[in-house]
Every structure is written in structure tokens, then in C-alpha cells.
């Protein structure tokens, strides 16, 4: 009976987590009240710090994409605290992975000094996740993003693409992983002025989360320039 109850509880979290994820990623139509309701629903079934960190990360993502850096940073900080607590007591790929993801995104909503101090730590935590699970798609994505979206002197499209290619061909990706990979392929194609290739990747991404703000921007062949307040003149874009 206990095992059945635990299994059902885990399934309830998985379902609630997927629902929160879908609402957050379809942020063109998502309302804050819907996100918070889905967040609170998922929180009822959280059974460990990694799960808590995961839903905090999604809430941070929603507020970041709605230009509320203060709330985004608050949720990202909470995600970092929970995932750190988890990997310090029970090192797992999932704990290191969500820590790397939250740290990476937190760098975009905090000060430039925070980015400089913490941005270079992202690959270390992603690599720790991959050491425990070589097929951890989220950790590989964090590594790829470090090369693709980072300001100079860390930007290297060629290196980032190699990581994406290796992962998408060898790992099992969840829906959000696939969306992120497709969107990033499109971003790189636009950076390389290959709009036809970008559109192919965007069509794939649109099949997953059609109402995503970043997707809509990329579909207009527009994209954010990351690290604008940091010198990017020496970016290694290959």
C-alpha cells in the first residue's frame, strides 16, 4: 500500500510539473494567476529539494520572460538554494543539472558583476551532472548555451553546436529539452544569417510550444543580444 501511494504521489508531481511547464513555455497566452495556480498545484506533490528547485526554476523563467527581474531572481535564488542543499547531501545528476540551469538564467536577471562572478561556474556544475549521467540533456544544454549565448571571450557558436548535435543524437529529450534545442539551433542559424534553416528549426519548435514569446521573436528573425553591458567585441563566433 505504501509503495502504491508513493508511486501515485510521484505520478501526481510529474503530471503537475508537466502542466506548469506547458503554461510557462506558452507564455504569450499565460497569465500570472495561471502560473501561480499551477506552481502551487505542483508544490503540493514536491517530495524532495530537486523537485522544489525545478518548479522554482520554471516560475523564475516565467517572470524573466515577462521582464520582472526581481521576481525572476527571487525564484532562481530559491532554486539554487534547494538544488545546492540537495547535491551537498545527495549528489545526483538532477541536482547539479538544475543548479547549472538556474545559475545560468540567474546571470541574465542579476547585475553584470553577478554574471562575471558566477557565469563561469555554470560549466563546472553541468559537467558534474554529466559525470553522473552522460545523457543528461539539460546539463548538455547548459554547456552549449555557455558557448552560444555567452558574451566575449566565451562565445563560440561552433563549440556550442557540436554539443547540441552530440546530445540530440544520443540522449532522450523531454518536450522542453526539444523545444530549447530547436530554438537554439534557430538562434544560431539567424546569427549566421541562414534564415531558411532557422525557419526549419522554428517550425519544429512551434509544434511543441506554439505560444512562446522567444519563439515568436525568433519567427520575426529577431533575437536578444546577451551580455550587452559587457564587452563583446572579441566574441569568438566561428
Regions found by a protein language model. Give the residues of each.
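Sec/Tat signal peptide C-region and signal peptidase I cleavage site
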Residues: 6-10
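Amphipathic alpha-helical repeat scaffolds of TPR domains
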Residues: 12-23, 44-65, 90-110, 135-151, ...
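Extended amphipathic alpha-helical interaction segments
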Residues: 115-176, 180
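Structural marker of alpha-solenoid helical repeat scaffolds
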Residues: 45, 88-89, 132, 170-174, ...
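Terminal, low-structured helical/coil segments at or just beyond the last alpha-helical repeat
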Residues: 176-187, 191-238
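Surface-exposed, polar helix/loop patches in the mature regions of secreted/periplasmic/lumenal proteins
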Residues: 78-131, 200, 206, 216, ...
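Helix-turn-helix repeat elements of alpha-solenoid scaffolds
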Residues: 24-40, 69-82, 115-123, 154-165
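Bacterial N-terminal signal peptides
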Residues: 1-5
Amino acid at each position: 500500500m505504501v509503495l502504491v501511494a508513493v508511486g501515485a504521489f510521484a505520478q501526481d508531481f510529474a503530471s503537475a510539473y508537466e502542466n506548469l511547464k506547458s503554461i510557462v513555455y506558452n507564455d504569450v497566452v499565460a497569465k500570472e494567476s495561471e502560473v501561480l495556480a499551477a506552481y502551487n498545484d505542483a508544490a503540493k506533490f514536491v517530495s524532495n529539494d530537486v523537485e522544489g528547485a525545478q518548479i522554482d526554476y520554471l516560475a523564475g523563467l516565467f517572470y524573466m520572460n515577462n521582464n520582472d527581474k526581481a521576481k525572476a531572481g527571487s525564484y532562481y535564488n530559491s532554486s539554487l538554494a534547494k538544488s545546492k542543499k540537495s547535491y551537498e547531501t545527495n549528489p545526483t545528476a538532477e541536482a547539479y543539472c538544475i543548479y547549472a540551469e538556474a545559475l545560468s538564467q540567474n546571470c541574465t536577471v542579476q547585475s553584470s558583476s553577478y554574471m562575471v562572478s558566477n557565469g563561469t561556474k555554470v560549466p563546472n556544475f553541468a559537467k558534474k551532472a554529466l559525470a553522473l549521467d552522460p545523457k543528461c540533456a539539460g546539463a548538455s544544454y547548459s554547456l552549449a548555451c555557455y558557448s552560444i549565448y555567452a558574451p566575449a571571450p566565451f562565445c563560440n557558436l561552433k563549440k556550442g553546436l557540436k554539443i547540441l548535435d552530440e546530445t540530440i543524437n544520443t540522449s532522450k529529450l523531454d518536450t522542453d529539452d526539444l523545444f530549447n534545442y530547436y530554438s537554439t539551433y534557430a538562434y544560431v542559424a539567424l546569427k549566421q544569417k541562414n534564415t531558411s534553416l532557422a525557419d526549419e528549426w522554428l517550425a519544429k519548435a512551434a509544434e511543441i510550444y506554439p505560444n512562446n514569446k522567444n519563439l515568436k521573436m525568433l519567427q520575426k528573425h529577431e533575437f536578444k543580444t546577451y551580455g550587452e553591458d559587457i564587452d563583446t567585441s572579441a566574441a569568438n563566433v566561428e
